[in-house]
Amino acid sequence: MSLARPNARLLSRTNRVFSSQIRTYSAPGDGVIPPAKKKYVPTSGTYPRGFKVGSAHVGVKASNTRFDDLALITSDTPCAAAAVFTKNKFQAAPVTVSRDLLKERGGQGIRAVIVNSGCANAVTGKGGIEDAKSMAKHTDACFTDSPDSPDSPYRSIVMSTGVIGQRLPIDKITSKIPTAFANLGDTHDHWLGTARAICTTDTFPKLMSKTFKLPSSDREYRIAGMTKGAGMIHPNMATLLGIICTDVPVAYFPLRRILASAANKSFNSISIDGDTSTNDTVAILANGAAGGDLIDTKFHSDFESLKQVITDFSIDLAKLVVRDGEGATKFVTIRVTNARSITDARRIASSIARSPLVKTALYGKDANWGRILCATGYSTARNPAVPEETSVSFVPTDGSEELKLLVNGEPEQVDEARAAKILEAEDLEIKVSVSNTPGKDTWFWTCDFSHEYVTINGDYRT
């Protein structure tokens, strides 16, 4: 039996389609920001008092021969600090070391965060733990003030990101920590350069800053944050790497409560590919340099206002990660309404957000709402969607009327031309109402899957 000969014209056309979608993988922090992403990179900022940041080139990853891959964030004075970490069972060495030092210190007296990109220091055994401790120890040594005692816990939080299962070139890293310290500064360029140094497959540095006031006074406070992540993003307590700094005077216990709440509504509400990293960490440092009354309990008059500020700020930071999803062409908001509980709503939204079939349909601009319904139906919600009461819509971002796809379990006659127009946009919303009984709503943010995602991750270790 003979095989059919391939259609040369079809093969040629297919190759052109694939080659037009794939970009060459480049070294972390190479500065080549896609034109469409430049609008997300700030050209200026107002940064919290008493913090300085800097970076240095180590060459952790062999392909990175000249771009900074070691980042240092410091405070002139000791900070209250809190963090949320991954729940992946294979937790990276820096996660273990940082969690332990925060616990031993009671979230007090933290001076710095040290971050390397290019190697995750995950699944590296006892040697990896010692390497993470060495990073903390060498960072602590840069400060001239004496620690509480020779046996005091480390004062520097450690983060790593990159390839799993490989040991750090620890001597190279520790030899460059003094260089990063010497490069410290408080200008916008310092902050932007440091945000770039924590990148891996990111196409742009993710940095934000803002000023705000609290009800108790007219004093101006400041907050700044940087984050990294473009792949292996799916929430489980925290996700990716994030560092937030503020000059508000706030004690550890209320700060920890605020971060836990903020992370749940932001970093825990995004998904790029459904993978939860071994290294996920989001930390917040508060040095009180702006002065004012110390927020020492959750009953303080400024507590709720500060929680809202940090939550909104965290949501905006988390959205930047989704906008830089590996190979992504769309930013998608998933809104689930009328669920029996917030947990149910989040599980349904998460199920839709991580569905490869939903994400590839969005990339192909295909209004295949059946895939959305399928993901809704197999979610792990304790109280699932009511099939005969479920409705699905596309909501355009231009303010025009939503396009109903399914109403009370009955398919609508879809205007395919309008659906295609909505799906052409960079931003869109998928709205899923899971019953007709008023209930709980939630938001989740995700992106599409393109050919480029496969290319980047097939080539990640090189």
Swiss-Prot record:
Active-site residues annotated for this sequence: T239
GO molecular function, one term: glutamate N-acetyltransferase activity
Positions bound to substrate: T200, K228, T239, E326, N457, T462
GO biological process: L-arginine biosynthetic process; ornithine biosynthetic process
Site (described: Involved in the stabilization of negative charge on the oxyanion by the formation of the oxyanion hole): T161, G162
Record-marked site positions (Cleavage): A238, T239
Catalytic activity: N(2)-acetyl-L-ornithine + L-glutamate = N-acetyl-L-glutamate + L-ornithine; L-glutamate + acetyl-CoA = N-acetyl-L-glutamate + CoA + H(+)
Processing after translation: The alpha and beta chains are autoproteolytically processed from a single precursor protein within the mitochondrion.
Pathway field: Amino-acid biosynthesis; L-arginine biosynthesis; L-ornithine and N-acetyl-L-glutamate from L-glutamate and N(2)-acetyl-L-ornithine (cyclic): step 1/1; Amino-acid biosynthesis; L-arginine biosynthesis; N(2)-acetyl-L-ornithine from L-glutamate: step 1/4
Keywords: Acyltransferase, Amino-acid biosynthesis, Arginine biosynthesis, Autocatalytic cleavage, Mitochondrion, Multifunctional enzyme, Transferase
Classification via PANTHER family: ARGININE BIOSYNTHESIS BIFUNCTIONAL PROTEIN ARGJ (PTHR23100), ARGININE BIOSYNTHESIS BIFUNCTIONAL PROTEIN ARGJ, MITOCHONDRIAL (PTHR23100:SF0)
Note: This protein may be expected to contain an N-terminal transit peptide but none has been predicted.
Protein family: Belongs to the ArgJ family.
Function summary: Catalyzes two activities which are involved in the cyclic version of arginine biosynthesis: the synthesis of acetylglutamate from glutamate and acetyl-CoA, and of ornithine by transacetylation between acetylornithine and glutamate.
Protein name stated in the entry: Arginine biosynthesis bifunctional protein ArgJ, mitochondrial
Species of origin: Pyrenophora tritici-repentis (strain Pt-1C-BFP) (Wheat tan spot fungus)
